[in-house]
A protein has these predicted regions:
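HhH-family (HhH-GPD) DNA N-glycosylase catalytic core used in base-excision repair
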Residues: 1-252
Length: 252
């Protein structure tokens, strides 16, 4: 259930409820380690990011309130008619709809998984705001450390993202849209040629409507389609399906 109201300054306040348990430390830790400077800002209890929807830029902040099992969200965006879409993306990002108690109850029946489930109850699968952004990150993350991938994706965002001015410190630009990276010169940024070509191919196919990483394709259709792109292997395709398509059966 969510409630919303317009706050002074044009921000909309939302309250998204979730069913416990929820391992907030694991969720925010995962997102923080992979945060794109200037696009995302993560603390021990909050997550914030810029976004672009239907050509209009905005941002949101999410504050986790474990005692009340709520996520308090402030959205700054000029078109309230798209608020429903924004809420759904935020829910998917934090895997809000997961019934963690039921999932843990099932997994604890496995003798090998049981100790981990008992130690870390309420683990959820982090989603994403943008399937394209995630695909770029996944491609750049091939055969390198998470830290190295974060460095590369931050270079792309800083050079080709649109400047953004909001009221949240650390949010300075939006991640570049596919059309921007179709023509972007990514040489000299430390990215190998095959990955540059893969990013450009994904962007081109999204622009032509041949690929959909926003829920318009199921995993059975999406994985073979994106795997046709040179430089995108099974792990990358399954990872994108797991986080962008919210497929519980995807297995990177």
């Amino acid at each position: 259930m969510n409630r919303n109201k317009l706050k002074e300054g044009g921000n909309i306040e939302l309250s998204l409820s979730y069913r416990p348990p929820f391992d907030l430390e694991a969720m925010l830790g995962f997102l923080a380690y992979r945060a794109i400077p200037g696009v995302e800002a993560v603390t021990a209890h909050s997550y914030a990011r810029t976004f672009r929807l239907e050509g209009l830029a905005g941002h949101f902040q999410a504050f986790f309130e474990p005692r009340s099992h709520n996520i308090r969200v402030y959205v700054s965006y000029g078109e309230t008619r798209h608020l429903g879409r924004i809420i759904e993306r935020i829910r998917a990002l934090f895997d809000v709809r997961a019934d963690s108690a039921q999932i843990d109850e099932f997994l604890v029946q496995d003798s090998q998984l049981a100790p981990m489930v008992r130690r870390f109850p309420g683990l959820r699968v982090p989603g994403c705001w943008s399937g394209f952004e995630l695909a770029v990150r996944a491609i750049l993350g091939q055969q390198v450390t998470v830290k190295a991938a974060s460095t590369l994706v931050s270079r792309v965002a800083e050079r080709y993202g649109e400047a953004y001015e909001g009221d949240v410190e650390g949010l300075n630009y939006t991640f570049p849209e596919p059309a921007r990276l179709v023509v972007a010169d990514l040489d000299g940024m430390g990215i190998v040629g095959v990955r540059i070509a893969a990013i450009r191919a994904v962007a081109e196919q999204l622009e032509r409507g041949e690929l959909d990483i926003g829920g318009g394709m199921d995993t059975e259709t999406f994985v073979p389609a994106i795997r046709k792109i040179k430089g995108v292997g099974e792990w990358t395709a399954q990872y994108i399906a797991m986080r962008a398509l919210s497929d519980p059966n995807a297995f990177p």
